[in-house]
Regions:
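N-terminal loops that bind phosphate or other acidic moieties
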Residues: 1-121
């Protein structure tokens, strides 16, 4: 695996299911849910997954969420760990297909669009 995808509830498993359906490349990621984990337990789970998988990149769902906070604590002592937060499907698709992390993040940014509908909706 190239990266860990972490988030609340079934976020990681769900978004990786979409990556698999579209590209067949979900095996490039390891999912992690924060469900039932304390902050310390979440950090321990991250450390174990990173150690076992060799992944050096973490994608998380929310900038101030527990998964991001745990990953950032680890990154303070591991300068090679890259944390990307606010992840969306286009970002993971680009990364799975071989883009480096910076290009994958840019793909996610470019994909985010406001499609105008009725005002006030």
């Amino acid at each position: 695996p190239r990266a860990v995808v972490a988030g609340h509830g079934d976020f990681a498993a769900g978004i990786l299911s979409a990556v698999q359906q579209i590209t067949g490349l979900a095996d490039r990621f390891v999912p992690l849910s924060n469900t039932g984990l304390s902050p310390a337990g979440l950090e321990d789970a991250f450390r174990q997954l990173l150690r076992e998988s060799g992944a050096r990149i973490v994608f998380t769902d929310l900038p101030a969420g527990s998964c991001t906070m745990a990953a950032r604590r680890i990154a303070k002592t591991d300068p090679e760990l890259v944390v990307v937060t606010g992840v969306a499907l286009p970002t993971l698709l680009a990364f799975a297909c071989g883009s480096d992390v910076s290009d994958a993040v840019e793909s996610g940014r470019k994909a985010l669009q406001l499609v105008e509908g009725p005002r006030g909706a």
